[in-house]
Design a protein with these regions (language model features):
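TM-loop-TM module centered on a large, flexible mid-protein loop between adjacent transmembrane helices
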Residues: 69-74, 236-286, 293, 338-340
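Hydrophobic alpha-helical segments and their helix-loop junctions in multi-pass secondary transporters
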Residues: 94, 98, 153-176, 193-196, ...
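Membrane-interface loop-to-helix entry segments
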Residues: 135-163, 336-348, 368-376
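Hydrophobic, small-residue-rich membrane helices and short re-entrant helix-turn-helix hairpins
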Residues: 136-147, 180-183, 203-232, 249-262, ...
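Membrane-water interface regions at transmembrane-helix termini and the short interhelical loops
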Residues: 64-72, 127-148, 209-212, 322-335, ...
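Hydrophobic transmembrane alpha-helices that form the core helical bundles
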Residues: 31, 79-114, 282-302
Length: 438
C-alpha cells in the first residue's frame, strides 16, 4: 500500500471516528463498568459489538450498495427504505438523541456546579444556540469541532491512566448472567447504527475528493477507514468501561449515567478535570445537536423535493427537542428502550444481509428477514410500552421470546429472522412473487 493511501485511510478514519464520537455516548461505558464490575470485559465486548462495530459495518455496506441513505433497505422496497430512513432520522434527531444532548449538558456541566439550576433555562440557551447556528453559521461548529475532539481524547486518556495507576476502590464481584445481552442492548442507546447509512455518503464524498473514483478502490479504502475508526472508538469506550469498573464497589445500577461520568472524572482528575470535561462535553453536545438537526432538515427537505422548507423543519425539530429535553437523560433513555427494541433488530438484519448482497438473488430474502426480526422486536416493544404504563400486555408472548435461542446474547430475534428469510426466499423462488436482483 502506498504512503498516500495509508495517510488518506488514517485521515478519513479519524474523521469517521469524530463523526461517531458523540459526547452523549460517553455516559454509557462507565455505567456498564459499574454494573459489570469484575466481568467488565464481557460487558465491554458486548457493547463494542453493538457500537462501534455495527455502525461501521453499516457505513461500509451502505457504501457497497451505492452510498445513499436509502440504499440499506431498498431491496425490501423503495417505500420501506424511505420509511426506515425517516424513522431513523427522527430517532437520532428531535425525538431522542438531540434532546439528550441538551439534557446531558445540563446534568454533566450546569448541574455539577449549580445544582439548583432549572433544566428549562439550560435547554432554552442550548437549543437557542442550536437553532441560530443551524440556520446561520456552520463555520462556528467546524471551528469548535476542530479543537474539541483532541481535548476530549486527552482528558479520556488521562482518565484511563489515572484509573490504572490509582484505582479508587476495586472491582465488585458480579454475575455474568444476562450481562452480555444487557450490554449489547445498551449499545442501542447510542443510535449510531441508525445514522450509519447517512455517514456512508460523507465518507464516499471525501474519498472521491481525494482522487479515489473507482468503486473497487473506494471499497478497499472504506475497509481501512472502518478499521481505523473502530480501533479508536474501541479504545475510548474500553477505557471508560474499565474506569467505571474500578468504582463498581462505590456505585450500583441506580446511579444516573451523567452523574457517574462527571463524578468519576472528578475523583480521578480532580476539580480541574471536572471543569474541563464539563466544558468540553457541553460544546461537543452542541456540535452534535447542530449536526443532527441540520441533517434532519436537509433529509426531509430533500425527501419532499423542497415542499417542506429546511428552516421550518429545523425550527420544529428544535422546539420538539427543547420540550423533550426537559424530561432528563434517564427518562429519555427509558422511553427509547421500546422503540429501539423494535427498530434495531431490523437494522442489524439489513446490515448483515447486505454484506452478502451480491450473492442474494431474491429481494424477498430481505423482506423475510425484516419481518422475522420485527415480529420479535415488535412483541418486546409493545410489552415494554405496556409495562411503562403499568400494564402487562402481551406478557405471555414476551416471555416466550425470552426462551428463544441466543436470548442470553440479545439475539432472540435472529432465528425467527433467518426462518423468515428462508421461507420468503422459497416462496419467491417457486411462485415468482417479489423481485430478483437486477
Amino acid at each position: 500500500m502506498s504512503r498516500k493511501k495509508l495517510t488518506d485511510i488514517m485521515i478519513c478514519g479519524f474523521a469517521l471516528f469524530a463523526i461517531f464520537f458523540g459526547a452523549g455516548n460517553l455516559i454509557f461505558p462507565p455505567y456498564l463498568g459499574v454494573i459489570s464490575g469484575s466481568n467488565w470485559g464481557i460487558a465491554n465486548i458486548a457493547f463494542l459489538l453493538s457500537d462501534p462495530l455495527l455502525p461501521i459495518l453499516g457505513v461500509i455496506v451502505t457504501a457497497l450498495l451505492g452510498g445513499q441513505a436509502t440504499d440499506l433497505g431498498k431491496r425490501v422496497s423503495k417505500h420501506f427504505s424511505i420509511i426506515i430512513g425517516a424513522i431513523s432520522i427522527i430517532l437520532i434527531g428531535p425525538l431522542f438523541a438531540v434532546p439528550r444532548t441538551g439534557a446531558t449538558t445540563h446534568e454533566i456541566f450546569v448541574q455539577s456546579f449549580v445544582p439548583t439550576a432549572p433544566q428549562w433555562i439550560t435547554s432554552l440557551i442550548f437549543f437557542g444556540l442550536t437553532l441560530y447556528i443551524a440556520i446561520h453559521s456552520h463555520t462556528v461548529i467546524d471551528a469548535i469541532g476542530k479543537y474539541l475532539t483532541p481535548i476530549l481524547l486527552i482528558i479520556l486518556l488521562l482518565v484511563f491512566i489515572a484509573a490504572v495507576v490509582q484505582p479508587n476502590a476495586g472491582f465488585q464481584t458480579t454475575t455474568s448472567a444476562g450481562l452480555f445481552s444487557q450490554s449489547f442492548k445498551e449499545g442501542y442507546q447510542t443510535m449510531d447504527a441508525l445514522g450509519a447509512a447517512l455517514m456512508a455518503g460523507v465518507v464516499i464524498s471525501d474519498l472521491t475528493r481525494r482522487g479515489y473514483t473507482e468503486k473497487k478502490e473506494q471499497y478497499q479504502m472504506m475497509f481501512g477507514v472502518g478499521i481505523v475508526s473502530f480501533i479508536l472508538l474501541a479504545l475510548v469506550y474500553s477505557s471508560l468501561t474499565y474506569a467505571g469498573a474500578t468504582v463498581s464497589t462505590v456505585y450500583d445500577s441506580t446511579v444516573q449515567r451523567p452523574a457517574l461520568l462527571i463524578e468519576l472524572i472528578e475523583q480521578l482528575l480532580g476539580s480541574f478535570g471536572k471543569v474541563a470535561m464539563g466544558i468540553a462535553v457541553s460544546f461537543a453536545c452542541l456540535t452534535t445537536s447542530v449536526g443532527l438537526i441540520t441533517t434532519c432538515g436537509h433529509y426531509f427537505s430533500t425527501l419532499t423535493n423542497g415542499k417542506l422548507e429546511y428552516k421550518k423543519i429545523v425550527v420544529v425539530s428544535v422546539v420538539l427537542s427543547f420540550l423533550l429535553s426537559l424530561l432528563g437523560v434517564d427518562a429519555l433513555l427509558q422511553l427509547a428502550v421500546p422503540v429501539l427494541s423494535a427498530i434495531y433488530p431490523m437494522v442489524i438484519a439489513l446490515i448483515f444481509l447486505s454484506i452478502f448482497d451480491r450473492y442474494i438473488v431474491y429481494n424477498w430474502t430481505y423482506t423475510g428477514a425484516v419481518v422475522g426480526a420485527f415480529f420479535i422486536g415488535g412483541i418486546q416493544a409493545i410489552h415494554l410500552f405496556s409495562q411503562m404504563q403499568g400494564g402487562n400486555f402481551l406478557a405471555e408472548l414476551a416471555t416466550w421470546t425470552n426462551t428463544l435461542p441466543l436470548h442470553q446474547f440479545g439475539f432472540e430475534w435472529l432465528v425467527p429472522s433467518i426462518i423468515g428469510s428462508v421461507v420468503f426466499t422459497v416462496i419467491s423462488k417457486f411462485t415468482g412473487m417479489g423481485s430478483k436482483r437486477v
